[in-house]
């Protein structure tokens, strides 16, 4: 269902920290023109943690409106309370979203049984396709392959965004899950290797800046042409790394403004503006990448 380059979309804000519709529309048009496969609206990169639930819902709905059927929209619906995750998911049931990305509960560090029961409860309360999201560096808990395998038996749990950066994970998960279960990288720097090992795509931060290039990398990889895929990816490696010098999405928003994709790189506290030293590294990376910006 979801393969190739999927962008973890930034949430553009004006100088007052309110959502900038003009910039959001420009970003969506950029991804449509670049043939990005889908948009994830309000995930980690979209600053879900600093938005109210009402804002969260409104931005996803605005993204759907502006996309107007031209590109699939996946709603971020994760929460560290199961009832809240279910409530948020149900709000999008008849909205037109193509599916949901649901991160493991953060901060409260549930057991594997707790994680299983959490996602089981979500699955049983919606018909929307669900993509699990494992990012232990952010959440403080790790969704292990054995638990993923148990969850893969639910018809609407269709895949996982695996963002540990541990390539051995893909082997372990592939051995345990059903054959049509989607394996999607959540780490740009290792995404191509992930795909060579059997992954179907990446939910990408880099695609905010290099949409065409990420689309081309994934397209080549899915065809088995890893020579051309690696040729492009080599140019982007500095960028993959520079975008995480500071916590995401600090660097990517600054760079999106720098290249004219958004009007302002405003973030909400506790996220703070990019450091001068990081700007230097980002400028170096963007020059090396030699991007084709629409």
UniProtKB/Swiss-Prot annotation:
GO terms for cellular component: cytosol. GO terms for biological process: diaminopimelate biosynthetic process; lysine biosynthetic process via diaminopimelate. One of its GO terms (molecular function) is 4-hydroxy-tetrahydrodipicolinate synthase activity. The active site is at residues 133, 161. Pfam families: DHDPS. Its main location: cytoplasm. It is an enzyme of class 4 (lyase). It comes from the Bacteria. Keywords: Amino-acid biosynthesis, Cytoplasm, Diaminopimelate biosynthesis, Lyase, Lysine biosynthesis, Schiff base. The record marks 44, 107 as: Part of a proton relay during catalysis. It catalyses: L-aspartate 4-semialdehyde + pyruvate = (2S,4S)-4-hydroxy-2,3,4,5-tetrahydrodipicolinate + H2O + H(+). Pyruvate binds at residues 45, 203. Its EC number is 4.3.3.7. Pathway: Amino-acid biosynthesis; L-lysine biosynthesis via DAP pathway; (S)-tetrahydrodipicolinate from L-aspartate: step 3/4. It is found in: Cytoplasm. NCBIfam families: dapA (TIGR00674). PANTHER family: 4-HYDROXY-2-OXOGLUTARATE ALDOLASE, MITOCHONDRIAL, DIHYDRODIPICOLINATE SYNTHASE. Catalyzes the condensation of (S)-aspartate-beta-semialdehyde [(S)-ASA] and pyruvate to 4-hydroxy-tetrahydrodipicolinate (HTPA). Belongs to the DapA family. Homotetramer; dimer of dimers. This is 4-hydroxy-tetrahydrodipicolinate synthase. It comes from Buchnera aphidicola subsp. Acyrthosiphon pisum (strain APS). The lineage of its organism: Bacteria, Pseudomonadati, Pseudomonadota, Gammaproteobacteria, Enterobacterales.
